[in-house]
Amino acid sequence: MQDKQKIDKFIDIRARLSKNAITAMERLEETGYEAYIVGGSLRDILMDRSVHDFDITSSAKPEKVMEVFSDFKVIPTGLKHGTVTVLVEDEPVEITTFRSESGYSDGRHPDRVSFAKSVEDDLGRRDFTMNAMACRINGELVDLFGGQKDIANKLIRTVGDAKERFSEDGLRILRAIRFAAVLGFEVETGTRDAIHQLGHMIEKVSEERIVSEFNKIMLSENPSTYLREYKDIICIFIPELEACIGFDQKNHHHVHDVFEHTLRVVDNTPAKLSLRLAALFHDISKPICFEIGSDGEGHFYGHASKSAEMAENILKRLKYDNATITDVCQLVKYHDHQIENSDKIIKRMLRRLGEEDFFNLLDLKRADNYGQSEEFRYRQDILQELERSARRILEENACFSLKDMAIKGSDLIKLGMAQGPEIGEVLEMLLDKVISGEIKNDRQELIACLKDTGAIE
């Protein structure tokens, strides 16, 4: 039975709508059509979350929408699916006709999209109850599937039969996990069971869409909760993780298996994508590199480099951008590298990693330590001292990269060096001497060094 009621929490829905969304809805209603705020924008309004884009659904067919807004710039963004974008004072307002969908032969997209007679029919095609509500400009709410109740109980629940919803579109499986992770919700029991039963539907989803959802899970407040609960789903597109689950490290540094240790590291890193991904992959090669040493303990010689190699293959397969791949692999490669607290060593690491990744590496090392046995927690103090030293070096404007040098390649050419790769090699040699403290980053002293080494006359 249809449940229409005033929104108690928001007596005046207008207070949460943009002026241009109000203009669009009023124009539609004044010309005899129904207009509703719907989907994620209404969900976020009900949850007191910020809303940037307002989705409007209407009884008006696309051509009628274009007539109603004939004095506005109208973009027929998706006429086939009933979507028209109206520019109201340069703000794009998307208006979609009530519609129904049927047939999902590819497990992702509907074979047929047709216009529906009512908003109730439109809401029935949506994925989750919290996204299947609609509200008119006067505050009249249509909530047929208990979306408000599920929001109050912090539950992700499909509209109707969960198996049907996930069989229609495999992406909904990841969306359910992502919504739970980002909102801090639980997935309702029947919906959760269907996710585990139909995980294979993810194989029909493009890498780009998988990555878009997975990144949001990784950047949520407590990703480990959802990576643990849905590890079978994650392993469908990152099968390399499967060997880590339950893998006993047999080492006194560790009280957790590789996967549980990894989850703790992920949770303890700041919410930066490259850092969280590096945390996920930092020990992924441990099952491959494992061996029992003469001391009777498990060892993982070379696992940092091997994990970086595996991370690169995984990220390329999932079509991550090159910058992210480079950052993640660099952090994984050096996560187990011991950094001595000396200006010379720290400058060399700053030179090798760059300022941002150097501090990201320290964050990864801290998180890695928190995932180990408590008896080694004293290393947090060592890492804190390293950070203090690095920040002091930066505050002193110490030279640790070519851009900081008091002499440039153009200067070497003016001093008589021939243009070519030798210029770069000479600059690197000078930088190395400056970092090691052999010479100062002073133009005259650098030129004197060039003469002493025979680089110039």
Predicted segments, located by residue:
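Catalytic cores of the polymerase beta-like nucleotidyltransferase superfamily
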Residues: 1-457
